[in-house]
Regions:
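Alpha-helical transmembrane segments of multi-pass membrane transport proteins
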Residues: 1-252
Length: 252
């Protein structure tokens, strides 16, 4: 729902972290679990990074990217669940509060309106009712209505600050896109993507070897650079290499 790993980690960490501490979980374990599961926020659509990649890659279908994110996101989530369950059992963590079946049903029905946003946004984009950009507007309006009138988690007096924070974040993203576009043009003008492509293809023309090398490089890059600028800067370098090997832009 958040569309961002950072947003998912921040939101869930602030909510789940204190609860886990009350239940007796180690802070290290809680932090590790939160960080490890955060990437599902950008893998399972809607995802802002996928929209950014669609822009940089020359118009890759956003709907196709969204659909391609479901299986990796679900597999990542299941893998995290299995590992966390194993270590929770090993360390003897137990939930001190038990919930009745009626409470579980009540919470489930309370969550349905929020979960419906995924169905509305993704369904609308895939069916062609609205574009990805229009889908983001639908998501904002729908979540605003839920927050104000259904869940009542925010007040009207808080809206100005929320709008200002959103405008600030949008301005930062637009600035990053502008600067990264200039850098991409400079790299294309100086022939850097071609040089990198020739160097990597000189190592191997096996697509799996090339993908392995790219993943290692992106792993290193990701330790000091945020996802959005990394996507904007390095997609124009690595994507032509994969296209030369016949890879689909969605797969990349």
């Amino acid at each position: 729902i958040s569309g961002s790993g950072t947003a998912a980690a921040s939101a869930m960490g602030s909510i789940i972290g204190p609860i886990e501490e009350e239940e007796g979980y180690d802070r290290d374990f809680s932090a590790a679990a939160n960080i490890a599961t955060a990437p599902t926020g950008l893998l399972i659509p809607p995802s802002n990074v996928m929209i950014t990649y669609s822009l940089v890659s020359g118009g890759t279908s956003v709907a196709a990217l969204f659909m391609a994110g479901y299986i990796p996101g679900i597999l990542w989530g299941l893998a995290c669940m299995a590992v966390i369950f194993y270590f929770a059992k090993k360390k003897g963590y137990r939930s001190t509060k038990k919930y009745s079946n009626s409470e579980k049903v009540k919470v489930f029905f309370q969550a349905i309106p929020c979960l419906l946003m995924i169905v509305i946004v993704i369904g609308g984009i895939i069916s062609g009712i609205f574009t990805a950009t229009e889908g983001s507007v639908v998501a904002v309006v729908y979540s605003l209505i839920l927050s104000l009138f259904f869940y009542k988690s925010i007040k009207f007096s808080e809206l100005p600050k929320i709008f200002l924070d959103s405008a600030e974040m949008t301005g930062i993203i637009i600035f990053l896109i502008g600067v990264s576009s200039i850098m991409s043009w400079v790299m294309a003008f100086t022939g850097i993507p071609t040089a990198v492509s020739e160097a990597m293809l000189g190592i191997s023309n096996n697509r799996y070897v090339i993908l392995f090398i790219i993943n290692i490089l992106l792993l290193i890059i990701g330790t000091f650079m945020d996802m959005t600028p990394a996507c904007l800067i390095f997609t124009p370098i690595f994507l032509p290499i994969c296209q030369a090997l016949g890879m689909n832009t969605v797969h990349f």
